């Protein structure tokens, strides 16, 4: 006798929105604590990230605080559709305020984000995104903790670097 098992994970745009509320809270907290961008600008980034996520194009988002060419702190939000993540509360995203520092926000999209996808989202994005070839491996920082945000089968895992 043989048995089989099928496991599926489904989610809706409502689930993506629920997770994005937590990501937005983190981005706003990072913006407010560093002073590197305004809360309004953080919400514009969050809008675009959510748009990419809702359309299934987003792989991860990398946020880095840079001062004098040196990474000070970073966090990476990686999409996870396994349905196995916890649902933590946003927080622990207060970063230092360093004079002259700036935030680098990089989105990495899935291969499905092709020319047709760009056309589909044309005019809907709030940030003027451009290609980035920076090293975002955070080799000078140490991975330390993070958070998990999920709703049904959709989630994002946050990894922090100090």
From Swiss-Prot:
Keywords: Antiviral defense. The keyword Hydrolase does not apply. Residues 138-162 are annotated as: Disordered. It comes from the Bacteria. GO terms for biological process: defense response to virus. Residues 139-154 have a biased composition (Polar residues). The keyword Ribonucleoprotein does not apply. Sensor protein of a CBASS antivirus system. CBASS (cyclic oligonucleotide-based antiphage signaling system) provides immunity against bacteriophage. The CD-NTase protein synthesizes cyclic nucleotides in response to infection; these serve as specific second messenger signals. The signals activate a diverse range of effectors, leading to bacterial cell death and thus abortive phage infection. A type III CBASS system. Expression of this CBASS system (Cap18-Cap6-Cap7-CdnC-CapW-Cap17) in a susceptible E.coli (strain MG1655) confers resistance to bacteriophage P1. Forms complexes with CdnC with 1:1 and 2:2 stoichimetry, and a 1:1:6 CdnC:Cap7:Cap6 complex. Belongs to the HORMA family. HORMA1 subfamily. This is CD-NTase-associated protein 7. It comes from Escherichia coli (strain KTE188).
């Amino acid at each position: 006798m043989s048995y089989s098992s099928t496991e599926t994970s489904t989610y809706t745009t409502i689930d993506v929105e629920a997770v994005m509320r937590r990501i937005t809270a983190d981005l706003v907290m990072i913006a407010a604590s560093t002073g590197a961008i305004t809360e309004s600008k953080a919400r514009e980034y969050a809008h675009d990230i959510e748009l990419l996520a809702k359309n299934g194009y987003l792989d991860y988002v990398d946020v880095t605080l840079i001062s004098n060419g040196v990474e000070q702190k970073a966090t990476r939000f990686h999409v996870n559709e396994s349905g196995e993540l916890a649902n933590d509360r946003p927080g622990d995203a207060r970063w230092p305020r360093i004079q002259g520092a700036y935030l680098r926000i990089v989105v990495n999209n899935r291969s499905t984000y092709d020319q047709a996808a760009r056309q589909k989202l044309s005019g809907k994005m709030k940030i003027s995104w451009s290609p980035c070839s920076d090293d975002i491996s955070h080799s000078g920082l140490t991975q330390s903790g993070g958070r998990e945000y999920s709703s049904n089968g959709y989630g994002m895992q946050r990894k922090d670097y100090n």
